Regions:
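Flanking helices and flexible, charged tails adjoining ferredoxin-like Fe-S electron-transfer domains
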Residues: 1-5, 167-239
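Iron-sulfur-associated redox domains of electron-transfer enzymes in respiratory
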Residues: 1-123, 128
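Short gly/pro-enriched beta-turn/loop segments at secondary-structure junctions
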Residues: 2-5, 128-130, 143-144, 149-150
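Local cysteine-cluster metal-coordination motifs and their immediate loop/turn environment
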Residues: 12-17, 47, 60, 65-69, ...
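Surface-exposed beta-strand edges and their flanking turn/coil or helix-capping segments
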Residues: 22, 52-53, 97, 155, ...
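Small-side-chain structural scaffolding
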Residues: 23, 29, 43-46, 133, ...
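Helix N-cap / beta->alpha transition motif
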Residues: 39-42, 136, 210
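Ferredoxin-like iron-sulfur electron-transfer modules
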Residues: 121-142, 153-179, 188-197
Length: 239
């Protein structure tokens, strides 16, 4: 059941997991029904940057990706968990029913066109958007395997708790730490398949990732970056 009149939709602008036409149609129908609607380009980015809008958004209904992912993201940002509907997995009639609207609601064509234009205007940053892990603490056993595996300083240990400390350090499109998690507690909301993306399927039927190769590749990249920084320092002219 919908908790409030204000509804926030996430467009996931730099990825294609959420159909933009569905976003435009849903926004138009909600607006026609008298709801206050806001489309956010990338909720993950707002959360990574800990936007001061998060508390406001959390007080209302959020229509975005998988609820388990949204819950973990808002908990990481130390914000209340909003009522969430899954736009990534559900079709338009299912979402409308969950929002207490007729499943066959008329779609206002002019407003759909306006929202479509808004969506097309969002900045797209393929390869540079907010890719980072979040942790489902209801599953995490604080074993620290993710911390030990990651070469980029994404995780830290605070007491006996694993914390995502530097999300911006994460290597784009690398979910290797999630593959190594014994309880499937690590979520990458922008990953393609469940359970790594927070979807509820029991087992993932994806092409397996060779974590040893990923680790070695990441290590080489890190060593190369370190050598480059040392070279720059050596060649810097003296004052």
């Amino acid at each position: 059941m919908m908790q409030s009149q204000k509804i926030t939709l996430c467009a996931c602008a730099s990825r294609t997991f959420i159909n933009s036409e569905k976003v435009a149609q849903l926004a138009a129908i909600l607006e026609a029904a008298g709801k206050a609607v806001e489309i956010v380009p990338d909720l993950c980015e707002w959360i990574e940057n800990k936007s001061d809008r998060l508390k406001e958004i959390a007080a209302h209904t959020v229509v975005a990706c998988h609820p388990r992912a949204i819950k973990a993201l808002f908990e990481w940002a130390e914000q209340p968990v909003p009522h969430t509907l899954d736009m990534r997995a559900n079709d338009l009639p299912t979402l409308l029913t969950a929002l207490d609207l007729p499943a066959d609601s008329a779609i206002p064509a002019e407003r759909v066109a306006a929202f479509r234009t808004q969506l097309e205007g969002f900045s797209k940053q393929p390869g540079q958007d907010a890719w980072f892990p979040t942790i489902d603490k209801s599953r995490c056993i604080e074993c620290g395997k993710c911390h030990d595996f990651c070469l980029f300083g994404v995780y830290t240990l605070e007491g006996k708790k694993v914390v995502v400390k530097a999300p911006q350090n994460c290597k784009n499109n690398c979910p290797a730490c999630a593959r190594n998690c014994p309880t499937q507690a690590i979520i990458f909301p922008k990953y393609a398949q469940a359970p790594i993306n927070g979807g509820e399927q029991a087992e993932e039927k994806a092409i397996s990732i060779d974590t040893a190769t990923l680790y070695n590749t990441a290590l080489r990249e890190r060593l190369a970056a370190r050598r480059a920084s040392v070279s720059i320092l050596k060649n810097r002219p003296k004052a």
